[in-house]
A protein has these predicted regions:
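Predominantly cytoplasmic-facing regulatory/coupling regions of multi-pass membrane proteins
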Residues: 1-96, 143, 153, 157-268, ...
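Short amphipathic alpha-helical coupling elements at transmembrane boundaries
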Residues: 49-53, 116-120, 130, 210-217, ...
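Transmembrane helix boundary and interhelical junction motifs in multipass membrane proteins
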Residues: 69-77, 104-115, 254, 267-283, ...
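Membrane-interface alpha-helices at helix entry/exit sites of multi-pass transporters
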Residues: 91, 109-111, 120-137, 290-302
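Hydrophobic, aromatic-rich membrane-embedded alpha-helical segments
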Residues: 91-119
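Membrane-embedded alpha-helical segments of transport systems
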Residues: 99-103, 127-148, 298-313
Length: 347
């Protein structure tokens, strides 16, 4: 019996649904604890006061920016999974965002649920794995481009803010080296695959090479949906910028970009929603770049709340709709799975 089929007791065994539900419950508890700490711990009273005095208009703008960020992810998802029907693909994209927020598996949770939902939609598991890698690489490279531009602009004094090379040119240089190594990987992977001939490692090397080449092709091919990759990141940064505007204190834009992107690395830790972890990482990075700790702490909490709950709400609704469709049309799903398996067998 598969995980998505009904059990003998009539209860659907849906580990994905259970993971999402448990993640949301955990996030709710952690969120309540953080809010309680802000108002109960004397040293955090200043943060709580900043939060309560934020300008509603700018918070509304932050909500709009987060919705636009989600739309950006939908667009780049549909560009990468170009054979996926638009409505179905949009729901899978939103579900991935929700799982990435709620399930304590870092980014692996969102990719896993995306593969589970896509399997049988005329896509083999191998195709899904390669396309998922392309999606990850496209969004990662957009992050890299943005960080390099901000770091160089800040380091050479084009944009206002600290010019310490360790905080500006060093991060940009490390990212440039990493991107160069990534772009050189296809040739090395193909040589490795040729030396190995056949086997799992050779197949993995060939798949890696194809994913990187496909990523490069997507980034260089004119397609209006590519703006989604930029919008996904830039509107998310705009959420934080709007939250700063709501406090009346706004660090230089390049500082926001760099501190946001480096601080976001804490999101890889397997903590549901990175609650507490991400806020601490943001505060540390912004203070390192010279920002004031109290407004940064307030902005970090509000930013995280906005991004989490819009993503979770929209993504959970999309997941429920997908689940209903799966159970309503099991024969259609079986036909798609047979088609995908036959295509995979013929490759």
């Amino acid at each position: 019996m598969s995980a998505s089929e009904p059990s003998e007791a009539g209860e659907p065994k849906e580990p994905q649904a259970r993971q999402l539900r448990n993640g949301i419950i955990t996030l709710s508890v952690l969120g309540v604890l953080i809010v309680a700490l802000l108002f109960a711990v004397p040293g955090l009273h200043g943060v709580g006061r900043v939060v309560t005095r934020m300008t509603p208009g700018w918070l509304a703008a932050a909500l709009v920016f987060q919705i636009l960020s989600c739309v950006g992810y939908i667009l780049i998802f549909l560009l990468v999974f170009d054979r996926t029907p638009a409505l179905f693909g949009a729901r899978v994209a939103l579900t991935e965002l929700a799982f990435g927020s709620a399930v304590s598996l870092g980014g692996a949770g969102s990719l896993a649920v995306g593969a589970w939902l896509l399997h049988g939609r005329e896509l083999s598991l191998g195709e899904i794995a390669e396309r998922s890698a392309v999606l990850f690489l496209v969004t990662t490279l957009i992050n890299a481009i943005t960080l390099v531009l901000a770091g160089l602009a800040l380091g050479i004094g084009i944009l206002p803010g600290p010019t310490d090379p360790l905080l500006t040119l060093l991060p940009a240089g490390l990212v440039i080296v990493a991107v160069a190594a990534l772009l050189a990987l296809p040739r090395a992977s193909e040589r490795f695959a040729m030396a190995r001939g056949t086997g799992r490692r050779a197949a993995l090397a060939r798949g890696t090479s194809r994913s990187i080449r496909d990523t490069r092709a997507i980034l260089l091919r004119p397609d209006w949906r590519l703006v989604g990759a930029f919008g996904y990141l830039w509107f998310n940064i705009a959420v934080m910028w709007a939250c700063f505007r709501a406090t009346g204190y706004t660090p230089p834009i390049a500082v926001i970009v760099l501190a946001y992107q480096i601080g976001w690395l804490a999101n890889v830790l397997p903590v549901p929603g990175s609650v507490g972890v991400l806020e601490g990482s943001f505060v540390g990075m912004f203070v390192l770049y010279g920002a004031k700790a109290t407004p940064v702490a307030a902005v970090s909490v509000v930013y995280h709340a906005i991004t989490l709950w819009i993503t979770l709400t929209w993504g959970t609704i999309a997941f429920i709709r997908l689940q209903r469709d799966r159970h309503r049309h099991p024969e259609r799903r079986a036909a798609h799975e047979d088609s995908a398996e036959s295509r995979a067998g013929g490759q």
